[in-house]
Regions:
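Short S/T/G/P-rich N-terminal loop/turn motif that feeds into the first structured element of a domain
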Residues: 1-68, 75-96
Length: 96
């Protein structure tokens, strides 16, 4: 197994009546190159997704599949702001 050196983090807020639907979809979703994933509940309907990847290249290869997945769950999410839309994503190399 390749040592993980890249991660992505996505903050989002679910609509109260869509929480179960979201987790049904996310639990069926798999991205090649993603070694592990975590979802933290950070508020009543607020969540933070963390994906651990083999490399920056691995996430780049999966980008179109990730956008398709977001399109599938977008309706389950509340807008965070007009500037951000429904997600607040960041990614980068794991340094510690």
């Amino acid at each position: 197994m390749t040592s993980a050196n890249f991660m992505n983090v996505v903050r989002f807020k679910l609509k109260p009546d869509c929480i179960e639907k979201y987790f049904e979809v996310i639990n069926k979703t798999d991205f090649e190159g993603m070694i592990q994933r975590y979802i933290a509940k950070t508020g009543n309907y607020d969540y933070c997704f963390v994906g651990i990847w083999e490399s920056a290249e691995a996430i780049a290869v999966q980008r179109s599949k990730m956008i398709t997945h977001l399109d599938e769950v977008r309706g389950f999410m509340e807008e965070l702001s007009p500037e951000l839309g429904v997600t607040d994503p960041v990614s980068g190399n794991i340094v510690a």
